[in-house]
Amino acid sequence: MAAYVIADVEVVDSAKFREYGAQVPATVEEYGGKYLVRGGAVEKAEGNWEPNRMVVIEFKSMDQLKKWYHSQEYDGPMQLRHQSANSNVLFVEGV
């Protein structure tokens, strides 16, 4: 079953976040992931959520998603994200 990373990202250091953005796609691809949403316009339909920059990444399974997220390849970029943005990240199983 497919699994998705859903992230709401508030960038606080643009230069470092650009560095993160340049590094992470290769790690996603290495683990079979595919970006479905990467930034772009966000329109809230209802609720109290005030989203920022939205990202959705699809993996073939939750196991593969977690292998990527906890990998050595993603560790460096993840540290850059922690330094350059405030993030809310979910892992969701889908169809």
Model-predicted segments: where are they?
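C-terminal structural segments of small proteins and small subunits
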Residues: M62-L90
